[in-house]
């Protein structure tokens, strides 16, 4: 999430839509009392020298923000509730949307990256000399994942049934 007082915009960061990349790029022009929430400490959030890919700043100055409970994805109702009306109404609200199919595939890969029960057990089965259909198992795991249901990103840019973001960038149209 970014609250840029210097440029008068709010970045409503969605999930699995290149939000971190956009936030990293936007954060480079933030300064002063702008707010940029910190990223989780994953290796892909660091550059080749090990430094952070974006400038986290001032998030701890927000009395309502808590890294463990709110994190870097702050939905529209929460932001509206906590920001002064002149900021919520007067700043440009930016967000990003992604094709739902691409997003769910990305979400599946992200959520299951460390879940051994969702990964094909190819090595074990090959050691036993049993033929293995890795693609079939992956498909079954993906179907199970999709059937559990997943949250949309609507809460970040839709408020009271209406689009509240002034600009919604389509992931597929970025280059």
Regions found by a protein language model. Give the residues of each.
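Membrane-interface amphipathic segments in extracytoplasmic regions
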Residues: 1-175
